[in-house]
Every structure is written in C-alpha cells, then in structure tokens.
Design a protein with these regions (language model features):
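Catalytic cores of glycan-processing enzymes that make or break glycosidic bonds
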Residues: 1-175, 179-188
Length: 188
C-alpha cells in the first residue's frame, strides 16, 4: 500500500488543511499531524483558501472551521487558517503566495481535468509589500519556522567625548619618559 511504502521510504507525508473539515477529529486536522510531514493549506490542485472557504465548503464545514481554528473577524479567516497550519507539529509548512495574499478563486493554480486556464496566475509586484513580508515573517517566527527579527535597540544618547588628560598628569608622564628617551638617543 502507499502508506507502507511511504513509511518504509522515510519520506515525509503530506497533510492538507482543505481535506480536514469533515465534522470529526480527522487525522487531517492540524493538531493530529505527525511531526514527519509537510503541511499545506492546499496544493496546486486545490482552490486557494479563500476560494475554497467561499465556494467549496458547506455551512457545517465553515462552522467547524470557525470553532476549531477560533476564527475571528479581527484576525481574519484566512490568517486564522494559516495560523492553524503553521502551528501544527509538521516539520515543514508550505503556503502559496496566493494564500498569503488572501486571493480568491481567480488565483487558483490548476484545476485537474481542465486543460484550459491553468498556471496563469502571477503575483503582482505591487502586492509584494513590506507589510506582507512582515506578516509572513511574524507568523513564521511565532511558530519557530523562522528566526525572530532582532529587537530594535533604543537609540542611546552619545556619551560625551573623552576629555584630554589633565595638564599635571601630562607633565608627570613627560618627566618619567624623558630620561628613557635621552638614554635611547645616546645608545645610537
């Protein structure tokens, strides 16, 4: 069987969030992912998370998603679903750019069995913003999938420039080094 072959090969398995919402404690729910797997919200053959949630889920699946992932309006449904994948025990999590950008069905990569219109979506340069980079990094770092950004150090006031030595100390040093300098000259 495929499962036996996978176990014998040592390769990680795949877990796809979009296969998880069936009303039960499915093995495809993120808390059940084994560590040795790759977690995906969806694959290139699935709709985007937004497209899936809006067009392919039932009311019961949406209700389960809201409860299981503790989805809130403030965080946003897509961000909450991504959080679930990133927080899973999976050693590796892969999220498409279309899902990070919260795109709908217009950004779907491939529809199996449909020979037309596939692999045409491209990310627009205007969508690659510092805010998006920060979101990806913060969510990845929160679940130890990236190094945290270094904390910004508060600006320190410059210390006053060192003051020259007192004249008395300079004179004392000149007295103690003068005989050594004179001896060095006479040795030549």
């Amino acid at each position: 069987s495929v499962r036996v072959l996978l176990a014998e090969s040592g390769f990680p398995g795949m877990k796809v969030l979009q296969f998880s919402l069936n009303g039960t404690d499915s093995l495809d729910l993120p808390h059940n992912y084994p560590a040795h797997c790759v977690a995906y919200p969806g694959t290139h053959d699935n709709n985007t998370l937004r497209g899936w949630l809006e067009n392919e889920t039932t009311p019961d699946q949406r209700k389960q998603a809201k409860a299981y992932f503790a989805l809130t309006e403030q965080e946003g449904e897509i961000t909450g679903l991504l959080r679930g994948v990133l927080a899973s025990p999976a050693e590796l999590a892969i999220v498409t750019m279309a899902d990070w950008l919260e795109k709908g069905s217009e950004a779907r990569m491939n529809t199996p069995g449909n020979p037309a219109g596939n692999w045409q979506w491209r990310v627009a340069a205007k969508d690659l913003t510092p805010a998006l980079a920060r979101k990806i990094h913060e969510m990845s770092a929160r679940y130890f999938r990236a190094e945290p950004l270094p904390e910004a150090e508060p600006k320190k006031e410059k210390a006053p420039a060192p003051q020259p030595k007192a004249k008395a100390a300079d004179a004392k040093e000149e007295k103690t080094t003068a005989p050594a300098k004179k001896a060095a000259k006479s040795a030549k």
